[in-house]
Amino acid sequence: MDRMVTLAHKFLAEVVSCGDLALDLTAGGGRDTLFLAQRTGAAGRVFAFDIQKEALDRTRSLLEEQGLRASLLAERGFPRAESGIFLVKDGHERVGSYVRESVKGAIANLGYLPSGDRSIATRTETTLQALAETLPLLAPGGRLAVIAYVAHPGGRKESEAVSALFRDLPSDGWRTMKTEMMNRDASPFLLMAERV
């Protein structure tokens, strides 16, 4: 079976293309940022958020290995409408301080940085705020994918809250779906939303 990240990428690949604006709300190791950068191409823009310098360093290294260059945004503000990959050392809950334009695709891979400090993880309150700021940015047909993990401290509460947010989106403006492994305790699951 495909991993949740692979499914999330397939879901976003259907709508994110060259020249689009896309968001990685949790840069982590950089795989999602790289995927979005490859989809949006040289004419597109990707913003990748993380509070950890280590995560942004890993992301930058992965991008450079693939011949891609990223710029670090040192302070809040709206960069000119130039193309590129922008690494933002700030919480994902402040996405609205950096992005005001229509977004074609966004992804959040919740939890902690793999092989990193497990005490630093996404939190329910900031994740809900990040999603509340991201959803209105999505263009018609735009999509959001969230991979939720329940096994780390606070993960179950966060996962349940994000699931409730997706479930409660009005059906006349959104299509939502949840994909999960049913016979594995505490396995990650994927939440997907599309603006109609």
Predicted regions and their residues:
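Conserved SAM/SAH-binding beta-strand->alpha-helix loop
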Residues: Q52
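Class I S-adenosyl-L-methionine
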Residues: H152-V196
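Mobile active-site "lid"/loop adjacent to the S-adenosyl-L-methionine
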Residues: I107-A130
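S-adenosyl-L-methionine
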Residues: M1-L21, L25, R31-L34, Q38-R39, L56-E101
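A short acidic, Gly/Pro-enriched loop at the edge of an enzyme's catalytic core
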Residues: S17, G96-I107
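Conserved beta-strand signature within the Rossmann-like core of class I S-adenosyl-L-methionine
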Residues: L137-A148
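Short beta-strand element of Class I
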Residues: A43-F49
